[in-house]
């Protein structure tokens, strides 16, 4: 099964299944000497963890990370960094009675078609539990970026038709929706609880931003920066849309409005007076803030009676019980940050190979 490794110079490989013994990752290409704190990686994993609030899955996992290699005395050695998290609350029995049925909205059917065999325990490798490795690897990428003055932040921008109207970044980690608008966050919680009572789920939008990104990151044509970021975001389970800058709003704009005028700033650098382009032009970073939004579908696991078929194609009905997220948005925030960090760390290291300095 290919497709488990992401990146060219700074590379992440994830492994493990939802209800297997453990999940984890290997980070390769991390420069030696980088400060790596297990506590910081754990902090990032805690933000992604299930069971952290009443708007997430009730599965109880501590997600305690163990660094197995590549770090000595708190610093990267340059060797592959291997990290492991044991699954301690897996309950595959919840899926025993539906193992031969195709869950609507899930990858059961497509995996069967492709491989002829699948792990039916909570989706196996296709489960969002795989993203533990992404967040752990992304934490290492964040440390690398921080040393170069780059920071990444994300938040829940929209749940259903509820949109954040105020952007107070200090509010994001103060509420369980990770929404920067406290008033709207409270409404979102009510909406999620209502959906759970109705045996349903909700989708929404997460906004992601990167600041301090130097100009010049990204490769022309097929490895454009936004192309790699788009691939990273679309690889996250449940993501159905990605837009940069003004996104699909450009369809309603004119060139004279959308174009961002260049200017020379007081410190001598060149920048733009606006940022409709979202920090990337021609597939290469401009030095402005990188701005993108990702749309997540409603989680497919709902306890309502739904029509489906079994592996033989016989019509039947299915109810999916167990411990499932009524919305992915709060836990999507750290995952999206991690994936953007992985792309930027990779392109930062690749940029060192792009030109000879005089």
From Swiss-Prot:
It comes from the Bacteria. Reduced FMN (FMNH(2)). NADP(+) binds at residues 48, 54. Pathway: Metabolic intermediate biosynthesis; chorismate biosynthesis; chorismate from D-erythrose 4-phosphate and phosphoenolpyruvate: step 7/7. It is an enzyme of class 4 (lyase). It catalyses: 5-O-(1-carboxyvinyl)-3-phosphoshikimate = chorismate + phosphate. Coiled coil: none annotated. The keyword NADP applies. Keywords: Amino-acid biosynthesis, Aromatic amino acid biosynthesis, FAD, Flavoprotein, FMN, Lyase, NADP. GO terms for biological process: amino acid biosynthetic process; aromatic amino acid family biosynthetic process; chorismate biosynthetic process. Belongs to the chorismate synthase family. This is Chorismate synthase. The gene is aroC.
């Amino acid at each position: 099964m290919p497709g488990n490794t992401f990146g060219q110079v700074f590379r992440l490989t994830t492994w493990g299944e939802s209800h297997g013994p453990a999940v984890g990752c290997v980070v390769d290409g991390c420069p030696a000497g980088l400060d790596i704190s297990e506590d910081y990686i754990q902090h990032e994993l805690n933000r992604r963890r299930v069971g952290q609030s009443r708007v997430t899955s009730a599965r109880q996992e501590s997600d305690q990370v163990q660094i197995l290699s590549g770090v000595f005395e708190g610093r990267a050695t340059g060797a592959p960094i291997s990290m492991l998290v044991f699954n301690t609350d897996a309950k595959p029995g919840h899926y025993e009675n539906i193992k031969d049925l195709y869950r609507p909205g899930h990858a059961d059917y497509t995996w069967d078609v492709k491989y002829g065999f699948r792990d039916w325990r909570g989706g196996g490798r296709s489960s969002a539990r795989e993203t533990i490795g992404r967040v752990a690897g992304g934490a290492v990428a964040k440390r690398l970026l921080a040393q170069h003055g780059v920071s990444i932040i994300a938040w829940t921008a929209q749940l259903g038709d509820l949109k954040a109207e105020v952007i107070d970044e200090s509010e994001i980690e103060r509420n369980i929706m990770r929404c920067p608008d406290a008033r709207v966050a409270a409404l979102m919680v009510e909406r999620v609880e209502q959906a759970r009572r109705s045996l349903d789920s909700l989708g929404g939008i997460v906004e992601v931003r990167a600041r301090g990104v130097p100009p010049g990151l990204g490769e022309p044509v097929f490895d454009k920066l936004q192309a790699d970021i788009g691939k990273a975001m679309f690889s996250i389970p449940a993501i159905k849309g990605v837009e940069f800058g003004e996104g699909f709003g450009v369809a309603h704009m004119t060139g004279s409005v959308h174009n961002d005028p260049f200017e020379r700033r007081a410190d001598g650098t060149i920048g733009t007076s606006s940022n409709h382009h979202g920090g990337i032009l021609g597939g290469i970073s401009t030095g402005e803030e990188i701005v993108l939004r990702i749309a997540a579908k409603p989680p497919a696991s709902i306890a309502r009676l739904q029509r489906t078929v079994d592996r033989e194609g016989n019509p039947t009905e299915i109810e999916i019980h167990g411990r499932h997220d009524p919305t992915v948005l709060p836990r999507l925030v750290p995952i999206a940050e991690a994936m953007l960090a992985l792309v930027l760390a990779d392109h930062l290291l690749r940029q060192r190979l792009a030109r000879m300095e005089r």
